[in-house]
Amino acid sequence: MARSGDSNEVVARWEGGWRATVQAGPFSFAVDEPEEVGGTFTGPMPTEYFLGSLASCYALALAWSARKRGIELPDLEVSAVGEYDGPRFKQIRLTVNTSLPVEQLEPLLAPASRVCYVSNTLAHAPEIDVRQADVCA
């Protein structure tokens, strides 16, 4: 688990058109746009990865919360739906689907929210500093 002051880096390389490849440690994945907007539809859109990051982080945080309390999760699915407002989401709704009884799930939600890096980042927006890399001549 990361601590304050640690950092994490991924690199996106533009592949032409509306396609990019993201390198995250030893993993890489395609990012693209649908054909109707000029993409080649060879991978999810950036906003889908964004929502997927939130949903998966929250799912893992719920699993952590359950394990910490000795609760076995029979199954778990978290969906994220973002409502567009211009070039951003104005609201994102997370829905937790599990056969775990509600009285066992409810106490897991607050601890999961406390440790989910993605939802915490969205709740407390970081500064975004865009700069050009140094060019070596």
Predicted regions and their residues:
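Extended beta-strand/beta-hairpin segments
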Residues: 1-52, 60-137
